[in-house]
Structure formats: structure tokens, C-alpha cells
């Protein structure tokens, strides 16, 4: 008999009483069934040279441990192989508020001025029953209210809510406050470090401020869990909460992660999907706006393929020189750069560095030389970093600087503006947004370098005015709740199913203040650009048509 000892984050397999056959069967299952291809490694040099593998295992065969989220699958495979096992439950679960649950199921609970919908109640009840797992509800179906209800259900527990953007932290705080949880809410993000409240909203970028809090956490809610339930930082936080056996992941796109290893990683950390509500169900039940996809076909000159999506940079890294031989080596390294050699040699001869003050002055001088040579210069600690573009990648040539494609986007926008629509255009790179905005007088541009005030102003601009357009970067790709948006234009293309669904979610919400009766998503068929454009377009069309089952129309423009 195999003993499985379960803890909050992992389970351990003990073979003391197992037969040799049971041991061999178990090890085969754990090694073969719980591994996946990590596509982020597939193009790395060691994998391409067959020195390393892009297959990664979740089973630690030295310690005989595995992430707890796979427990249900272990039981399935053990039962299938008729392996004798016993689960030794070591987790100490916090108790739910049964009286609140009773009133919730009767329909007597009101939160934030609204009564939970039947599917939201069903999701919460299933979550309480399972105590670990994913709630996958489509964007616009009220996942934040589900989180608020769970906070009420576990009314005596310390709860950690994971977010990964400033906007989502702000939005979640406002909604939970509206639901009557304001006095119990604390935020750890940026300058905010309130870790004394029962419920803590943590921006993952500020996780180091919360280390002292992790041992006290009993319940984890991972919002937008396709990211907050599986990244290295998220995993570090989850594994640090060793007293939190109750874990729920919440997102519209937990099962569309393109990387098989990362998809499986989310399950291992947070458990499998235990409740699902799709877009077509939300539309049929009139919780979402009926949505139509418009695919715009156009003609343009084919764009040559470079072979790398991102731009390629020449990079320089210089540590602070504190010895004469360091300066000598530095100059020798740049002797081939004729346009720098004179300046470097002059600097070398004039500055024999003997102390920190001279070192700082030398770094400043180098920074000026790099800038004149066309390098973008930054300083990270004591290291000087310089980079300049060696050549542009396919994203720039296919999307950002594709004049024909950008003109098509503007034509689509003008068509919608003539109908007095509120339009959101999403792009991936700031320079693309700047190009598009320059082609649309009177439009608003928002991106990650803008502060919360500017983002809020852009949000209110869309809410309060008809016949307007806002260009937004990936910061508005998810989680932004502006129900008045009529039309969304996918300006950045892309092949990720997760991104396609998240972006589409910006427009499907029902509007309580406007007469929006249909939401329109505009996307471009980039088949004419190159085989890359064709494959990416086919992937997005597959998501719209086959996964989301939304009506589509092809339009020549």
C-alpha cells in the first residue's frame, strides 16, 4: 500500500508498505503522466543541439513529492492501475460560514446592490465543496463578485488575493469595497503595504513586502489565474503559504494557455477547473451582450520574414572600473568600434580611476559616449547597460510599421466613428499606438508609462462620450471593466488564444447606461502580409468561431 501525505502545496509518496509492483507502477505513472513540453525552451540552444530536453516533469523523484493540485489525477491513475493506496490528510482546512452559505443558496444575500446570479452561487458552492480548483467564467460574467462571495464564505480566515497589474489591484479593491468588505481590505502594492487586514490584495510585483504575511494566510484567490497562478513569482508566493490549503484560481482563460507545461503548472499549483461558464452560455442567458466578429480582408505587398518576432539589439554591459587593467581591457574591447575609439582612449588617458567618485564620473562619461553612438543607456545598480537596434523583427515590419495595415485600421475606426460608437483599439507596442494615434486626430492614447490618473481619465472618456476612440496597450488587455465600449479593434494581431479571448472580453459586457444591443469585434485577416500573418489570423479565427462559437462576417476593405 502506498501512503500519500497531503500538505497545502505538495503531496509526498511513501512506499514503506508498498509492494515492488506497486512502487514500479506508481513511479511509471508519476514520471510519464505528469510531464509536459515547455515550448519556451524549444528554441533555446541546448534543446536545439539535443543537449537538453524541453520536456519538464512535475514529479521530484528524489524527494517523492508533487504539487497538490494533481491529487485528483493521481487517484484516477492509481484506481485505473488497481494500486492500493491511502491518503493521509495533513491539511487543516478553515471552516466556511455555513449560515452565510444557507442564506446565499436561498437567494437572500445582496452584495454591492445586486443579488448573485444562479451560476455565481453554483460556482461558490462547488468551490466550497472541492476546497481547491479553478473557476473559469467568461469575461463580463462577474468573477469579482464570486471572489467577494468567497471572502464572505470564509469570514474568519486570512485571505490573500493575487493580482499582477496596478489597474486590477485598484479595480478589485473598489469592487470588494462596494460589496461591503472595505473595513477588512488591505493592499500591498507600490507604496501601499497594509498587511494587517483580514483580506490582502497583493500585486505580485510587490511580493517581497508580504513575506511576513504568508504563514498566516489560509485561503488564496488567484485573479486572472492564467498568469497569477503559474509564473515563477506567483509560484513562489503560493509555495510560501504553507498554511493555505484552500486555493481557488479564477479566470476566463485557464484552459487556453498555449504552453503545455505552463497549462499543467497552473493545475499543479491551484487544482483543476471545477466550474465553467462559457461566453455562448452567457449570451444565451442574456448576461452578456450578443457579440459579432468582423474579419476585415485587405490587400498589401508581402513583407519579408526576418525570422525573429522581436527586434534584435546590440548590447553593451560595463561594470564600474576600479583598477587600471579594467580600463585597459575595456578600451581593447571597443577598439573595433572606430567611431568610439578616440573618445574611449581620451577618457582612458584622462581618468585613472582611484576612487568611487572618479568611478561615477567615468560611468557618466561612458553614458554620454554611448548615447552619441545611438545607444539607449540605462544603469542597473553599478552596471551600465547600453543597447541599440541591430535590425527590426517581424512584429515591427508586419504590424507596427506596416503602413497599409495601419491605414486599414484607421478606415475601420472611421467607419465606426460615423456610427457614433465608443471604440477601443488594443496594440502591443507603444510605438504602434503612437503611429495609430497620429493618424486619428482627437483620439486618446494610454499605455504602461501612464499613471493611474491618466488611465482613469481615458476610462471616463470612453464611458461618457459617444463617437470616440481610445488606443490602449496590453495594460487594458484584461480586467478593465468599461461596459459602455461598443466596438473593439484588434490592432496588434497575435496568435495567443488566451490573449484573443481576454481582449475580446473588453467589449462583451452589458451596458446599463447606453443603448448597446450588440458588441462588435473587428480583426484583420493578415494573410496577405506573409505566412506568419496567415497562421496568426487562422489561429484567432479558430478561437472566435470554434471555441467561442460567435457569428462572423468577412468584409473586404
What are these regions (language model features)?
Residues 130-151:
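Walker A/P-loop
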Residues 186-188, 193, 434-435, 444-474:
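Conserved helicase ATPase core of P-loop NTP-dependent helicases/translocases
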